């Protein structure tokens, strides 16, 4: 027997009341996006669960993809068959025979929503359990914590059998909590921040600052590859490349060295906020961790935040670097993040950046710039690319390999 579908159980969606179907429909759309590399698959959702019909597709890579999708509490590969007692008996015997080993314990757990079926749940449990003993006389039944719980569901349209329950990612479906702009540099922290924002249902668009020729095509490809890794958790992501060369050169030429980083981050925040407003986002997300570097002291954050009234979410702000690294390794972004390409935050980094910059000083130094013009030119020059879970070709990876 081959699995016919993966049955997905919803997570926190059960608490969403009148908005429940909106959340479920969004989860369905996200699952369809993530499973786009499997063209034979179809997806259907109802109030209780989502059905991923395999239609001949190997179930294992599908399970691996679904395990990462936020909003999924658990999933089970399922056999679908006609509602016939003889067919159920044969299926249960075949499945348990394939799983059997010495000392294995089991139980049958039947659920019947089709009350017109000839046997009730209790009778089915007894009948199917007896059928297992017929072919495996040495197997042991155990009602609490058995090795195998064989779940049988009798529904209006068919019967379903499963024995695996695989833990999902939990959280909320991406897109159910609004849209935010993720400032992604290419380092270790910002992809982790993006992952945690996605987990709470935030639909992120990635904002990446590029300063050619100071930053290379490899740095851009690296940021896009990190974004692609994040698509596994909720579907396609818009990648927004911002031209930042003019601004960085202006800051380098006109500002004191100690304030280079503060002014750079203030311009980045202004531009991200302008893009957010243009694209109807609600928040800005970044990977700042308190005290980790000079620009992430409270004084620096205050001086940088002053350019916007938009809420700024910092998911990793209280995490140690080792905690962030462990999470980056778990979500498979760490090895990409440590590839040796310069980004906008490092190319003109001063030897002794100001750790307690004064807002008044930052504003005074900015009087030397045409702030509105610089921001407007950067925003008008953005390039937007849709990043999908499916790598259509290997151009990005080949480019990175060639540059390393």
UniProtKB/Swiss-Prot annotation:
Annotated InterPro entries: Rossmann-like_a/b/a_fold, ThiI_AANH, ThiI_fer, ThiI_N, THUMP_dom, THUMP_ThiI, tRNA_STrfase, tRNA_sulfurtransferase_ThiI
Keyword NAD: no
Reactions it catalyzes: [ThiI sulfur-carrier protein]-S-sulfanyl-L-cysteine + a uridine in tRNA + 2 reduced [2Fe-2S]-[ferredoxin] + ATP + H(+) = [ThiI sulfur-carrier protein]-L-cysteine + a 4-thiouridine in tRNA + 2 oxidized [2Fe-2S]-[ferredoxin] + AMP + diphosphate; [ThiS sulfur-carrier protein]-C-terminal Gly-Gly-AMP + S-sulfanyl-L-cysteinyl-[cysteine desulfurase] + AH2 = [ThiS sulfur-carrier protein]-C-terminal-Gly-aminoethanethioate + L-cysteinyl-[cysteine desulfurase] + A + AMP + 2 H(+)
Any one cellular-component term (Gene Ontology): cytosol
Recorded metabolic or biological pathway in which this protein acts: Cofactor biosynthesis; thiamine diphosphate biosynthesis
Pfam families: ThiI, ThiI_fer, THUMP
Protein name: Probable tRNA sulfurtransferase
All residue ranges annotated as the THUMP domain in the record: 60-165
UniProt KW RNA-binding keyword: yes
Binding-site list for ATP: 183-184, 208-209, 265, 287, 296
GO MF annotations in UniProt: ATP binding; CCA tRNA nucleotidyltransferase activity; tRNA binding; tRNA-uracil-4 sulfurtransferase activity
PANTHER family (alphabetical): TRNA SULFURTRANSFERASE
Keywords tagged on the record: ATP-binding, Cytoplasm, Nucleotide-binding, RNA-binding, Thiamine biosynthesis, Transferase, tRNA-binding
Highest taxon above the source species: Bacteria
Function: Catalyzes the ATP-dependent transfer of a sulfur to tRNA to produce 4-thiouridine in position 8 of tRNAs, which functions as a near-UV photosensor. Also catalyzes the transfer of sulfur to the sulfur carrier protein ThiS, forming ThiS-thiocarboxylate. This is a step in the synthesis of thiazole, in the thiamine biosynthesis pathway. The sulfur is donated as persulfide by IscS.
């Amino acid at each position: 027997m081959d699995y016919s579908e993966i049955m997905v159980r919803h997570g926190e969606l059960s608490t969403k009341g009148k908005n429940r179907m909106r959340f479920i429909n969004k989860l369905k759309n996200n699952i369809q996006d993530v499973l786009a590399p499997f063209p034979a698959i179809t997806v259907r959702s109802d109030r209780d669960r989502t059905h991923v019909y395999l239609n001949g597709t190997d179930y294992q890579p599908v399970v691996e993809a679904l395990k990462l999708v936020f909003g999924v509490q658990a999933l089970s590969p399922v056999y679908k068959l006609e509602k016939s007692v003889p067919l159920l008996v044969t299926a249960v015997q075949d499945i348990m025979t394939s799983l059997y080993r010495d000392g294995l314990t089991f139980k049958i757990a039947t659920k019947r929503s089709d009350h017109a079926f000839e046997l009730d749940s209790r009778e089915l449990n007894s009948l199917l359990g007896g059928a297992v003993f017929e072919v495996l006389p040495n197997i042991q039944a155990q009602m609490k914590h058995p090795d195998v719980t064989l779940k049988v569901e009798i529904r209006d349209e068919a019967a379903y059998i499963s024995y695996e329950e695989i833990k999902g990612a939990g959280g909320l479906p991406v897109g159910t909590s609004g849209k935010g702009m993720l400032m992604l540099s290419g380092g270790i922290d910002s992809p982790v921040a993006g992952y945690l924002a996605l987990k709470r249902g935030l639909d992120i668009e990635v904002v990446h600052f590029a300063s050619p020729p100071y930053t290379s095509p490899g740095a851009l490809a690296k940021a896009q590859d990190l974004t692609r890794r994040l698509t596994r958790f909720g579907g396609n992501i818009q990648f927004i490349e911002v031209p930042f060369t003019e601004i960085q050169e202006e800051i380098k030429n006109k500002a004191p060295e100690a304030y280079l980083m503060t002014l750079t981050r203030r311009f980045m925040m202004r531009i991200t906020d302008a893009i957010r407003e243009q694209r109807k986002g609600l928040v800005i997300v970044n990977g700042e961790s308190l005290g980790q570097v000079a620009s992430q002291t409270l004084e620096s954050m205050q001086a940088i935040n002053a350019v916007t009234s938009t809420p700024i979410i910092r998911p990793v702000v209280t995490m140690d670097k080792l905690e962030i690294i462990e999470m980056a390794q778990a979500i498979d972004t760490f090895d990409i993040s440590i590839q040796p390409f310069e980004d906008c935050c490092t190319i003109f980094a001063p030897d002794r950046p100001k750790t307690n910059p004064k807002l008044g000083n930052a504003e005074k130094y900015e009087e030397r710039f045409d702030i509105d013009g610089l921001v407007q030119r950067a925003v008008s020059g953005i390039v937007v690319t849709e990043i999908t879970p499916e790598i259509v070709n290997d151009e990005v990876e080949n480019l990175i390999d060639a540059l390393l």
